[in-house]
Each structure stands twice: as C-alpha cells, then as structure tokens.
Amino acid sequence: MVGNGGCFCRKICYNSVILFEGEPDLKLSRLVFPPDGASRGTLRAHRAYLAVLLTLLGVGIGFLGLWLTACADAALPQAELYRSYLDHPLLLALNLFPPLLLAWLGYFLSGRCWCGVLLSGLFGVGLPLINYYKVMLRGDPMRASDILLLRTAGGIMSQYEFERTAEVNMAVALLGAMLAFAVLLMPRGDKRRRARALGAAACVLLGVVAYLGAYTDEAVY
C-alpha cells in the first residue's frame, strides 16, 4: 500500500511539472490574467483554469434552473420535488447537459467565457423563469410547443402584472453573480480560431446526437 501510494504521488508531481513546465513560480494573478508572451506552461494552466470554472458555471446554471422549476408551483412540496431531480442520476444529467453544452458553445463561438455563461443562462434560467410565471398565471407548465407561440404569448402576457417573488430575485441575482464572475475573473479566452471552430462543431454534434437519442426517447426522458 505504501509503495502504491508513493507511485501515485510521484505521478501527480510528474504531471504537475509537465503542466506548469516553464513557469515554476506561477502565481494566481498570472494564472487568471496571463501576460502577453506567457510560457506554454502558463497558458496550459490558464486553459485548465477556464475549463474547470466554465464547466462548474454551466452545471451551476443547470441546478439553478432546476431549483426555479421546483419553485414554480407553490401547491407542490418544493424540497421534495427538487430532491426528486437529484434522486435520478440519468434525469439529472439530461437536465444539466443543455446549459453545460451551451456554455461551452458560447465560449467556442466567441472566445469569451462570459458569452458562454450568458448563452447558458438565457436557456438554463430564462426558460425556467418563463415556466415559473406560466405556472403561476395559467396553472400549467411550459411545453416545447409554447416556443412556437411566443409572439401570441407576448400579447397575452402584456395583460398580466408580474410579481417579483423572492425565488425570482434570487435566481436573477445568482445568475448575475455568475456572469460578473466570468467577466471579471475569466476575461481572456482561447485565441486559437481553429481549435474553437472544432470545439463549436463538436458541441453542435453532441447536441444533435443527444436530441435524436436520449431527449426524444420517452423511455429515457
């Protein structure tokens, strides 16, 4: 056991040396804001930093949307409904996948993490927000066919007065905080256009495959 543990530690140290090679005294400020002409080790560490945080923000937006969906109907037990999402790993993954995918797609298309967070938030929080008010005003949840009736719905919704509830305020505030974090602490993106184009194409391909596979299968989703 001791020998295996020693080998494991040596592997971690070796991989860390490779990642930060050429930048032994890498500081947090250089990790977040790599200067022009930074070494390859710094740029690798910066890309890893962006990848981890962008993934966490995309998943966080997905959880925020699920929470807002659980709060839509006051007649239902919100805690139990939200827990039901967490109790089914496959269903949870399918609900978190679109916001995460859109976060990466927005990043690859623009080269800026905050654009990915904004695109993910418009879908991952925007649609649950529309569903929240539709349940509050009409008593029935939002369906995919409702997207095709947005113009008509806009005329109908103008007749209602929307109440800014605590749940809505919290969701908007948290999304705003995520967006501000991405703007301030994830400012620099990948300048390699070819790599970003390949990444965007991969996101589109994954989205199409997921939609035609899991999301249209009633036995799965």
Segments the model singles out, each with a brief description of its role:
Residues 1-2, 26:
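Accessible peptide chain termini
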Residues 3, 10-18:
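Short, positively charged and aromatic/hydrophobic N-terminal segments
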Residues 3-6, 22, 37, 41:
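Residue-identity detector for glycine
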Residues 14, 27-221:
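Transmembrane and membrane-interface helices of multi-pass
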Residues 19-26:
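Short, positively charged low-complexity motifs
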